[in-house]
């Protein structure tokens, strides 16, 4: 249980980073397109 609880935050942080990176890439692509 402890391991699972400690592993959950990591997954959430990774998802957040991936989301942020994806959004940054999208904005950059839009900026480049313009």
Curated annotation (Swiss-Prot):
Iron keyword on record: no
Binding site for L-ornithine: 13
Motif position, Ornithine recognition loop: 10-16
Biological process (GO), any one: transcriptional attenuation by ribosome
Induction statement: Induced by ornithine, repressed by putrescine. Part of the speFL-speF-potE operon.
Superkingdom of the organism of origin: Bacteria
Effect of inactivating the gene: Replacing its start codon by AAA (Lys) prevents expression of SpeFL and leads to generation of a prematurely truncated speF transcript, and thus prevents expression of downstream SpeF.
Keyword entries, A-Z: Leader peptide, RNA-binding, rRNA-binding, Transcription, Transcription regulation, Translation regulation
Coiled coil: none
Family: Belongs to the speF operon leader peptide family.
Subunit details: Binds ornithine in stalled 70S ribosomes, blocking the upper two-thirds of the exit tunnel. Contacts 23S rRNA and ribosomal proteins L4 and L22.
Role this protein plays: A small protein (arrest peptide) encoded upstream of inducible ornithine carboxylase gene (speF) that controls expression of downstream genes (speF and potE) by transcriptional and translational attenuation. Its expression controls transcription and translation of downstream SpeF; translation pausing at low Arg levels on this mRNA prevents premature Rho-dependent transcription termination of speF and also enhances SprF translation by preventing sequestration of its ribosome-binding site.
Cited HAMAP family: Leader_SpeFL (MF_00851)
Name the UniProt record assigns to this protein: Leader peptide SpeFL
Gene from which the chain derives: speFL
């Amino acid at each position: 249980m402890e391991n699972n609880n400690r592993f959950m935050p990591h997954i959430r942080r990774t998802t957040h980073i991936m989301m942020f990176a994806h959004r940054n890439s999208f904005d950059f692509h839009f900026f480049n397109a313009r």
